[in-house]
Swiss-Prot record:
Gene Ontology MF term list: methionyl-tRNA formyltransferase activity
Function: Attaches a formyl group to the free amino group of methionyl-tRNA(fMet). The formyl group appears to play a dual role in the initiator identity of N-formylmethionyl-tRNA by promoting its recognition by IF2 and preventing the misappropriation of this tRNA by the elongation apparatus.
Chemical reaction(s) catalysed: L-methionyl-tRNA(fMet) + (6R)-10-formyltetrahydrofolate = N-formyl-L-methionyl-tRNA(fMet) + (6S)-5,6,7,8-tetrahydrofolate + H(+)
UniProt keyword terms in alphabetical order: Protein biosynthesis, Transferase
Superkingdom of the organism of origin: Bacteria
Designated name of the protein: Methionyl-tRNA formyltransferase
Species of the source: Salmonella enteritidis PT4 (strain P125109)
Length: 315
């Protein structure tokens, strides 16, 4: 490849590994891979390598796992690779300005939203939570701000009524590598056209928490159904019954008006468990009691009908 670039790749989860895999078949020269240190995982808390490390070692690439890139000796690891560009995908560490300035073409990042909408940690989840009609990926030039750099390339993706964060993650993991390879070609041949972000259109994708995922029946059924899809597969929307957390995997919206207080169980049938909300009715379709597998509302009613007596209120 005549316009082959020397690339440092920095990333950690599976989403990042899919981008590294695309780079390795693109004709560019990946000269080093940075990923987060091995972390304890599973019941035995055994140290586990990141998906990016697993792929990099499988391909015989040099792997670096600093806890931080602030120390001078760790920055020197980057400098010694003499890269044309550093590609950053869900790395999880802050890149100091000294590192951002090292590669000839700077550092670029693959972000899971159509910037400037949803800067921050949870862009995929927040696009669902807000009811956006579309999302996508943005390849941007990195600067010292949080997702504030100039945009180099964007690819859009429609959000369907069935999408969860899990399904949208997979869609963007397919789109991202396409955009990345196109952007690298433009950088290599000098045709990249950076575009500044419109600050008037900025929204922030705050991190998710388990407490936020607790179902608040005062919200509308439409908003709660969005939350259930946005928080799937993590942290999972949940409610509490008899002191036990019950996860909600799937629900639908019934637009009918109700005079019942939010959280009131209106009906419990094989078609679902219908609960009054701040506006409309939420029909619970798939739930998971603590220590059990996810099951249909009908199966849960067969074993725990006393949990869902019409007229009772859910907390």
């Amino acid at each position: 490849m005549s316009d082959s670039l020397r690339i440092i790749f920095a990333g950690t989860p599976d989403f990042a590994a899919r981008h590294l895999d695309a780079l390795l078949t693109s004709g560019h020269n990946v000269v080093g891979v940075f990923t987060q240190p091995d972390r304890p995982a599973g019941r035995g808390k055994k140290l586990m390598p990141s998906p990016v490390k697993v792929l990099a070692e499988e391909k015989g690439l040099p792997v670096f796992q600093p806890v931080s890139l602030r120390p001078q000796e760790n920055q020197q690891l980057v400098a010694d690779l003499h890269a044309d560009v550093m590609v950053v995908v869900a790395y999880g560490l802050i890149l100091p300005k000294a590192v951002l300035d090292m590669p000839r073409l700077g550092c670029i990042n693959v972000h899971g939203s159509l910037l400037p909408r949803w800067r921050g940690a949870a862009p995929i989840q927040r696009s669902l939570w807000a009811g956006d009609a579309e999302t996508g990926v943005t390849i941007m030039q990195m600067d010292v701000g949080l997702d504030t750099g100039d945009m180099l390339y964007k690819l859009a993706c429609p959000i369907t009524a069935e999408d969860t964060s899990g399904s949208l993650y997979n869609k963007l993991a397919e789109l991202g590598p396409q955009g990345l390879i196109t952007t690298l070609k433009q950088l290599a041949d000098g045709t990249a056209a950076p575009e500044a972000q419109n600050e008037a259109l900025v929204t922030h994708a705050e991190k998710l928490s388990k407490e936020e995922a607790r179902i608040d029946w005062s919200l509308s059924a439409v908003q709660l159904e969005r939350c259930i899809r946005a928080f799937n597969p993590w942290p999972m929307s949940w409610l509490e019954i008899d002191g036990q957390p019950v996860k909600v995997w799937q629900a639908s919206v019934i637009e009918d008006a109700t005079q019942s207080l939010p959280g009131t169980i209106l009906a419990a049938t094989k078609q679902g468990i219908q609960v009054a909300t701040g506006k409309g009715i939420l029909n619970l379709l798939s739930l998971q009691p603590a220590g059990k597998k996810a099951m249909s509302a009908q199966d849960l009613l067969n074993s725990r009908r006393e949990w869902f007596i019409p007229g009772n209120r859910l907390a």
